[in-house]
Amino acid sequence: MFAVRYFVKDVSASIKYYSDAFDFELAQQYGPAMAILTKDNLTLWLAGPASSAVQAEKKVNPDIMPGFNRIVVLTDDIKNVTARALDCGGRVRIDIGSGPTGEQSILEDPDGNLIELFSSRP
C-alpha cells in the first residue's frame, strides 16, 4: 500500500477542499490531527499541526511548510476540473499546457500543496 502525506494547516478545511474539488472520500479522521482520504487507487493522508508527523518534523525544521511533493489527478476534462478546483479555493501554479503524452496543469491547494491535473491523449 502507498499513500501521499500532505502537511496542512486545517484538516477539516482540507477534507472539504479535496472532497469538493476532486471527489475524494473520507476514509478515516482522527480529530483535528489527521485524516485519510481515498480516490480510486490513491490514498491521501492530511496531517494537521497536531499530528505526530508534523510534530516530529518540527523538531528538525521548526519552520516546516508544505513541500514540493504533488499528487496527480487523472482526468478526461482538465478544464472543468481546473475551474472546480479554483472555485473551491485552489490556485493555478502552472496553467494548462500540452506535452507529448497529454495536457497537464499544476494547481496549489489552499495550503500550497501541489496538485498536477493530467489528461492523456487518446
Question: How does the language model describe each region?
Answer:
Residues 1-2, 25-73, 81-108, 119-122:
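Vicinal oxygen chelate
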Residues 13, 19-28:
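N-terminal first-folded block
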Residues 14-19, 85, 112:
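Conserved active-site tyrosine of GNAT-family acetyltransferases
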